[in-house]
Amino acid sequence: MGPVFYTSLPRDAQTPQGHGTSGGAARRRLVSILWERLVAMDSPLWPCRLPSGRDALPIQVVRDPLGKPHLLLGEYRGPAISFTQGGGAVWAALCGDESDIGIDVAEADEFQGDYPFGRVFNARELQHVVSLAGGDVGKASALLWSVKEAAVKALGCGFHLVEPRDIHVHPAVMGDGEYTFPVRLSRKALERLPLGAGRSIWVRSLPQAKTWLSIAFVNWQCR
């Protein structure tokens, strides 16, 4: 996995004029913040020069036919970017290399009562994540859902082409208070998304107050 930059802004942040920040305005600000971080790093992993300051090209967020966003630098394709909302904030993640990226945030409160766990999660993956969450099913479900949602965003299909149970989340590697999950697609999902066959899909998950933040990476060069 290459470098990734992520940050958030409060969904209802006040602007200097005293007006609330809309989701669209927050996203534009997030793009500017993350772009400046990428430029400052002067990443050797991005294949083109990263302009800034007076030499900067106009930056747009454009989407492919399935809705997967990436930056457009003038007429040149830029790095992948992803957005999500949760916990009262708008989040964005920008990839520092040519990988695709997806971000998601989920809260435990979303997974209570009669939530259809069996239609969304496979028994083995849920059991593993519940053990990571100390037996808290709601917290574990938020973590697992954020992993799956981030993965399909990085693949660029969302849940239009695959079902949640077709995203298989394997046991995590833990380090520095976060988890890294390898993710694979089921055979059924690969029939609909053959480009995903053998691809390297990794999801990094971090606790954020009452939410889980997950960022997925898909490297189309690696199998």
Region spans (language model):
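Core catalytic alpha/beta fold that binds nucleotide/phospho-ligands
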Residues: M1-R223
